[in-house]
Amino acid sequence: MYKRLLIIALSLLFSGVAFAQEQQDPWIWPDDHIKDALFLRIGVGPRIGGGMAMATEPSFFDFDLKGNLAYQIGATLNFQMANHSSVKPHGIGHWGLEIEALYGSRNYKSGDETMAMRCLEIPILLQFYITQGFLLEAGLTTVKLLNVSPGYLQTGGVVAYVGGIKGNDVMFSAGLCYKTSFGLDFGFRYNYGLSEWAENFHSKSSAAMVSVSYLFSLIK
């Protein structure tokens, strides 16, 4: 199932890239533009994503936790920095920074029950542009758990109080993205949880997500 998710995610990403490549290249500078200059782009806009949430099996329990759907919606603030030269007009070592505020829900299956964890996510990611539009990104995502439903999880005669799962997590996030010239971005990201759900519930979260965002330029 996870392989199918990955195939679908990559198909969506490259479909967006194929469409975007028909547009004008945003990194081509006119001949009369001043080169050898450091510049900064700032963009802000909405972001929406979906994918698969996964969790490791907790120690001392056999809940047979399985992955299920996850989604997130929110806003993103993006900074792009580059140093252009007359030798390489497309730029040398493009760097960027992305800060997001997302409301998300991660769902997990255990037998006939579905557990939903709703949370606030704050990713802070360093970005490196490997071409004019393609970039790699990596960083940390701070997660604040808002609520869990249902409060109890039961399977095989074992009942666990999951409403007491702690409210904070830190996830390592890495992915790739394609930015178009007209503001639409397509991305794939993997998040791996570094914290356990609770002292007596040793399970960690992860998620594979595809997303679409649209950036309005504040500074070009």
Specify the residue positions occupied by each region the protein language model found.
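Outer-membrane beta-barrel translocator domains and adjoining extracellular loop/strand segments
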Residues: 56-62, 109-116, 148-155, 198-204
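Residues that define the transmembrane beta-barrel architecture of outer-membrane proteins
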Residues: 38-44, 65-73, 116-120, 168-172, ...
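Repeated loop/turn-to-beta-strand initiation elements of outer-membrane beta-barrel proteins
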Residues: 84-87, 95, 134-136, 182-188, ...
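Outer-membrane beta-barrel "beta-signal"
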Residues: 174, 178-184, 204-220
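Transmembrane beta-barrel strands of outer-membrane/channel proteins
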Residues: 46-52, 99-103, 138-142, 188-192, ...
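Outer-membrane beta-barrel architecture
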Residues: 74-78, 123-125, 175-177, 211-213
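Sec/Tat signal peptide C-region and signal peptidase I cleavage site
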Residues: 16-20
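Short glycine/proline- and aromatic-enriched beta-strand/turn motifs that initiate or cap beta-hairpins
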Residues: 21-85, 193, 215-220
